[in-house]
Amino acid sequence: VKSDVVLIAFLLSVASPFAAQAGTAMQTKGKAFPPPAFYSFCSRQPGLCSTAGGTKVVALRPQLSAQLNEINLSVNSRITEVSDRAVVGKNDDWRVPTVSGDCEDIAILKKLELMKRGWPASALLLTVASYHGEGHTVLTVRTNEGDLVLDNLTGAVRDWSSTPYNYFARQAQGNGRRWERIGAAKSVGTTATGI
């Protein structure tokens, strides 16, 4: 099964939709309020709330693209989406899932797995949006090819502006406890640092 996930991740990275088109970066436009359960999560897991670090934009190489795809697919296949109410008896409870969780839990696990592989916390931002009138959380990865979204609703890693969501806010780079409102998309340049 693991070899199948790696093969699929490699094939997706080669045929990656964000490799063929110009990517976009999220423009931020001031302070936003974080989701209510975010602060209690940060008190329990400060390392996963961090966005500290010097690398703000990762230079995306084929092996890193493959890692994004592999982790997105692997976590999506291992973790069953279930509401917080069903799992812990609360409407909103951010945590690292082991078997099941909702969208923010799944995004947190993806951030954890990328950080274990050496990805900088400063380029891995928890991001909130809406989809069909419901709140939704994804992981945004800042790269020189655009801000890419790892999402529990799809196996595809996509440029954020190519998703069906209305984005509200994301963690601020350099201060993970602060959140910023999301504005328009801006074409990306080529300035990035490796990991």
Predicted regions and their residues:
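Bacterial N-terminal signal peptides
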Residues: 7-17
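Bacterial N-terminal signal peptides that target proteins for export
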Residues: 1-7
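An exposure/low-complexity boundary signal
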Residues: 2, 17-19
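A structural boundary/capping signal
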Residues: 19-195
